[in-house]
Amino acid sequence: MNSIHLPSNQRTSASSLHQHHPKGAQEASEMAVYCDNFSMYHQQNLHSSQRAPNYGIGDYAPPTNPYLWLGGPGVSNSSSYLHGNNPTSFMSPSYGSQRQFLSNSSSFCGTDLSWLSVASQEELLKVVRPPYSYSALIAMAIQNAPEKKLTLSQIYQYVAENFPFYKRSKAGWQNSIRHNLSLNDCFKKVPRDEDDPGKGNYWTLDPNCEKMFDNGNFRRKRKRRSDSSSAEAVTVKGEEGRPALGGKGGESPSMLTPSSPELEAASDDRKSTSPSGITSSPCLNNFFSSMTSLDTTSVNRQMSLGLVNELSQRNITGLGSFTSGSIAEPSVDLQDNSLHLNRPSYYSTFSSTHQNNQFNSHFYNTFSVNSLIYAREGSEV
């Protein structure tokens, strides 16, 4: 059995286990063999865990054969696993294989894309689209031409030869190149000479646009002919519309200045017609005359005493003469007449309807408090 070849410490551990389980001679012997085998593999794992940290990074040297770890002794030497006489014979091949595998993977990841062959690089270029616009491709083709001019077929040929991506499908990018040639102002069409045999016109770069192409990149945004023509039409319309607008703007002050007096006159007419219409209406005249007569009768009734009546009569007659004398002075504008239409009738103390009808315009500019009349001369709104 394998227990004969075990060290003394393993035998003592096995005997101690045998003493703890006294179940029978046969069961004890089987348990001892099982424990001996278990302790053997346990010691192998222990040695492996203690031995692994002893290896440094420098020990993992790259092998000569990158596939050596597949054909190493861990695969071919299977007898070391079957026979347990040398426990280190099983673990050493695994270390060799692990070292070789790690070195291979580290060397693989550290390199660049140099592992790709030339054929694989060409295949990659066929898949990846070049980072150039169609206008940039056309410009590169024309600039690399000896005479700085190419036909459409020659542009196709240059793009297909220098960029393998466009060799797969020709329909899509050829249409795009034709559209860019016709819509971009930087490409000019040059007619073919009579002595030059062949078909199709030449295409050249505009001298003003040569600086716009820098290493295949177009520096500014292309403008279409339709956009440029529409912009020119807008500018022409704007230039034509500016003098017309200026003329209208110049005439507007001259039109407003004569019309402003007319508007003022119309407003004055509106303001003046309202008092004139009120004074000319007989109904309102009769109303105001009746109100003044009621005022005079009420004043006479309230002041029935002799002295008070005389004073009131003197005041009324004096004020009546004052108002009749002051009426002759046209001091108040007619615009303030409409503001006093809502005043009550007790503000006026005229004694006769003749004065009311004759000097009705002054009636709206006077008011009386306690039978005293004051003229509102120079009043402003």
UniProtKB/Swiss-Prot annotation:
Regions recorded as binding DNA: 129-223
InterPro entries: Fork_head_dom, FOX_domain-containing, TF_fork_head_CS_1, TF_fork_head_CS_2, WH-like_DNA-bd_sf, WH_DNA-bd_sf
Gene Ontology molecular function: any one: RNA polymerase II cis-regulatory region sequence-specific DNA binding
Keyword terms of this UniProt record: DNA-binding, Nucleus, Transcription, Transcription regulation
Biological processes, Gene Ontology terms: anatomical structure morphogenesis; cell differentiation; positive regulation of DNA-templated transcription; regulation of transcription by RNA polymerase II
SS bond list: none
The keyword Nucleotide-binding is annotated on this UniProt entry: no
Lineage top rank: taxon: Eukaryota
Tissue: Detected at stage 14 (late gastrula) in a horseshoe-shaped ring surrounding the neural plate. In neurula stage embryos, expressed in the neuroectoderm and pre-somitogenic mesoderm with expression in the outer rim of the neural crest and neural plate at stage 17. Subsequently expressed at different levels in a subset of placodes, excluding the otic and posterior lateral line placodes. In tailbud stages, expressed in neural crest cells that originate from the rhombencephalon and migrate to the ventral part to form the hyoid and anterior branchial arches.
Compositional bias (Polar residues): 1-17
Cellular localisation: Nucleus
UniProt-listed Pfam families: Forkhead
A cellular-component GO term for this protein: nucleus
Signal peptide (residue range): none
Region spans: Disordered: 1-25, 214-278
Chief location bin: nucleus
Purpose of the protein: Probable transcription factor.
Name of the protein in its database record: Forkhead box protein I1c
Gene behind the chain: foxi1c
